[in-house]
Amino acid sequence: MKRYLIVFFIVFNIAALSQNRFHVNAATTLLGFPSLGYETQINKHLSFHIDAIGSAFNSYNDKPLRFLIVTPEMRYYPKNDHKGFFVGAHLGGSTFKLQKYGYEDSNYYQKGYNYMAGASIGYVYFVSEKIALEAFVGGGTVQSFYKGYDATTGERYDGAEKFNKSGEWLPYRGGISVILHL
């Protein structure tokens, strides 16, 4: 009986996901930063998209390179078929342990978290009924909170009491995704 319930559950979930899309950002994944996403249709023009990207490495050039970014996004498609041009608004967050730009010639690295708020634009092109390609870019404000460490001693180098803080306007999203429409 348990087997039948498990099979029913799997079949029911596949049927329930029939209007949904799974995304793999081919561009970042090939560079060693796997990015997976999920999108579900809300109405004729709106969808909810969420993706996560992370580092497949512990380090690069003997420097720390670990991060995970999760970004939920609301997308608006002017056409009612959820293909073609779209715009999106998103809020995201990340955790990281890496060496920031400008510290390449030192033993210093930064560890912390940030949040991001911004917009994306993109285009979805269906290759077949079930497979599509998506090109997109996005950016906005990035507000970071981190502590600086010396990799040789493990001691903090920055002198900040709690966290260093920085805020920038940056392009931080983009790529070419392969989409599987279920």
Residue ranges and their predicted role:
Residues 4-14:
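Sec-dependent N-terminal signal peptides
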Residues 54-64, 93-114, 144-167:
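Flexible, solvent-exposed loop segments that connect beta-strands
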Residues 28-30, 52-58, 76, 91-97, ...:
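Transmembrane beta-strands of outer-membrane beta-barrel pores
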Residues 76-77, 168-182:
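Outer-membrane beta-barrel "beta-signal"
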Residues 45-48, 82-83, 129-133:
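Repeated loop/turn-to-beta-strand initiation elements of outer-membrane beta-barrel proteins
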Residues 36, 72, 119-121, 174-178:
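Membrane-embedded beta-strands of outer-membrane beta-barrel proteins
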Residues 20, 30-32, 64-70, 83, ...:
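Residues that define the transmembrane beta-barrel architecture of outer-membrane proteins
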Residues 24-26, 50-52, 72, 87-91, ...:
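Membrane-embedded beta-strand positions of outer-membrane beta-barrel proteins
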